[in-house]
Amino acid sequence: MSFITKAACVGGGVIGGAWVARFALAGIDVKIFDPHPEAERIIGEVMANAERAYAMLTMAPLPPKGKLTFCKSIEEAVEGADWIQESVPERLELKRGVITKIDAAARPDALIGSSTSGLLPSDLQSEMHHPERMFVAHPYNPVYLLPLVELVGGKKTSKATIERAMQGVEQIGMKGVVIAKEIEAFVGDRLLEALWREALWLIQDDICHTETLDNVMRYSFGMRWAQMGLFETYRIAGGEAGMRHFLAQFGPCLKWPWTKFTDVVDLDDALVEKIGAQSDAQAAGRSIRELERIRDENLVGIMHALKSGNGGEGWGAGKLLADFEAKLWANARKPEADLGDVKPLRILDTKVSAAWVDYNGHMTEHRYLQVFGDTSDGVLRLIGVDLDYVRDGHSYYTVETHIRNLGDEASGEALYSTCQILSSDEKRLHIFSTIYNAATNEAVATAEQMMLHVDSKAGKAVAAPEAVLSKLRAITEAHAQLQTPDGAGRFVGQKRA
C-alpha cells in the first residue's frame, strides 16, 4: 500500500540528507528544513551520490524523481506531509523540542519518525499533543542504500502507527524491523557500541592499528555478517549438530578474559590523536566523497551478489532488492502510442548518469545496451508482454543484436529512444531502435535486434497469442510504410556509403 505522497525532512545532515534522497528517488516530493547555511549544497552532494548509486543498483525504471523544496521554518516544511522525519543532532532537549513543534504544525494523521540513534521514543514524545503517531525510525548510513530501519514505539505510540510505518518503509524500498521493547540504542547500535568499545581498547593498548583492525573485519567475519548475521553464522559454525552444539562448545569462552568492552576506555586527547593519525594514514589522501563513492559501489556489488543467491531467488538484502525491482517494473509507465501511427515509437526518455561514464569520459558500451534493452522492454509492454505475462511462462528472448555507436555522450546529457518494427510474424520480432541526443536530435547509437517468442518453461520458440499478435500487426503494418532506417541490415565492418 502506498500512502506517502509528500514527505518532510527536518534536519539535512548525513542522515537527514540521505533520507531526502531515499524519499525523492522513490518519487516522493520532499520539503526540507535545515537552518545550516549550506544545507542545499550538502543535500545536493548527497543526492548526487544517491543518484549515482541507484544508476548502478538497478536497471528497473525508477519513478520520476520527487521535487525538493527548501523551507524557512519547520511549520512550512511539515505542512501537508504524510511522513515527517526528524534528523537533528542527538540531544534530548533539542530533539524533543523539534518533535513537539512538528507535532503542533503537522496534519493530525501524519506520521512522525525520529532518526535518533539511541534516545527513547517515550522521552521524545512526552510533550506532544498527539504522541500516538510518533516513533523511532532509526536507519543506517547511507540511508539511500542500506535498507534497514529499526521501528521503535514509545509508551504512547499506537499499534496502528507502527503498522503504517512498516507500509511506508516498504513503499520506499526499505526493510522495517519492529523492536519489541524500547531500550536505549535499540538493537543495532548496542551491538555496534560493544564492538566499538573493544576496538578502542585494542588501539589504546597498541594491539593493532586502525587499518589492521578494519582488515580483520572486512576480510573475514564482516563478509559473513553481510549475508547471514550473527546467530545464523554461528549455527553453521556448530556443524551438523547445530546451534546447541556451538553453544556447548564455545559457552565456556564467556568466562575467559577475551573482552574489555564492559570497561569504558578513556577517550582522552592522546587516544583521539592516535586514532585520528592512523585513520588519516589509512585513508591515503582519499576525500570523504571518494570514500563514500567507493563504499556505495561496494554495497551495490554486495546487494547484486545477494540478489542472485539462494538459487536465484535472492537472499537477505538481495531478496529485498529483487522484490523492490519487481514493484518498480509493475508500476513502470507504459509507453503511450497510437499503434497505427506511421512513425517510429518514442519509448524512453533518460539522462546519462555519472555511473554510466567510463574512463574515456563518456557513456560506456554496456549502458547503450541497457538503454536499448529498456527500449525493447517498452515495446513489449506496449503489446501486452509485461511482468504478469512473463510470470505466466511466456516472453520474447533476444537472439541477435547489432549495435552501432555514432556519438559520445557525456554525463548529464538528455537522451530519448525510438523503435521501428521492421518485420514480425507469429514467433519473430525484428526491430530497429535509435538513441538520440535530446538537445540536438542527432542519433548517437542504433541497435538492430531479432527476438523470438518463447515458452520459457518448455524452453522453445512458440507462436504468440492473438492478443499480442493483433497489436504487433497494427504496428508492423503502419511501420511498413516507413523508409528502411539507415544502418538496418549492416554487418560489422561494412564501409559506410
Swiss-Prot record:
Q: What is its main location?
A: cytoplasm
Which UniProt keyword terms apply here? Cytoplasm, Hydrolase, Multifunctional enzyme, NAD, Oxidoreductase
UniProt KW Hydrolase keyword: yes
Q: Which catalysed reactions does the entry list for this protein?
A: carnitine + NAD(+) = 3-dehydrocarnitine + NADH + H(+); N,N,N-trimethylglycyl-CoA + H2O = glycine betaine + CoA + H(+)
Q: In the UniProt record, does the keyword NAD occur?
A: yes
Q: Where is this region: Betainyl-CoA thioesterase?
A: 336-497
In short, the EC number is 1.1.1.108, 3.1.2.33
Q: Which Gene3D superfamilies match?
A: Hotdog Thioesterase, N-(1-d-carboxylethyl)-l-norvaline Dehydrogenase, domain 2, NAD(P)-binding Rossmann-like Domain
Q: Which Pfam families match?
A: 3HCDH, 3HCDH_N, 4HBT_2
For molecular function, the Gene Ontology terms on record are: carnitine 3-dehydrogenase activity; hydrolase activity; NAD binding; NAD+ binding
Region Important for dehydrogenase activity, as annotated, extends over 330-335
Q: Where in the cell is it found?
A: Cytoplasm
What InterPro entries does its record include? 3-OHacyl-CoA_DH_NAD-bd, 3HC_DH_C, 6-PGluconate_DH-like_C_sf, 6PGD_dom2, HotDog_dom_sf, L-carnitine_dehydrogenase, NAD(P)-bd_dom_sf
* Gene Ontology BP, a term: carnitine catabolic process
Named in its record, the pathway it takes part in is: Amine and polyamine metabolism; carnitine metabolism
Residues that, per the record, bind NAD(+) = G11, G12, G13, V14, I15, G16
Q: Any idea what job this protein has?
A: Catalyzes the NAD(+)-dependent oxidation of L-carnitine to 3-dehydrocarnitine. Probably also catalyzes the cleavage of betainyl-CoA (N,N,N-trimethylglycyl-CoA) into glycine betaine and coenzyme A. Despite a high similarity to 3-hydroxyacyl-CoA dehydrogenases, cannot dehydrogenate 3-hydroxybutylate and 3-hydroxybutyl-CoA. Is probably involved in a L-carnitine degradation pathway that allows Rhizobium sp. YS-240 to grow on L-carnitine as the sole source of carbon and nitrogen.
UniProt-listed PANTHER family = 3-HYDROXYACYL-COA DEHYDROGENASE FAMILY PROTEIN (PTHR48075), 3-HYDROXYBUTYRYL-COA DEHYDROGENASE (PTHR48075:SF5)
On subunit structure and binding partners, the annotation says: Homodimer.
Protein name (database record): L-carnitine dehydrogenase/betainyl-CoA thioesterase
State the organism named in the record: Rhizobium sp
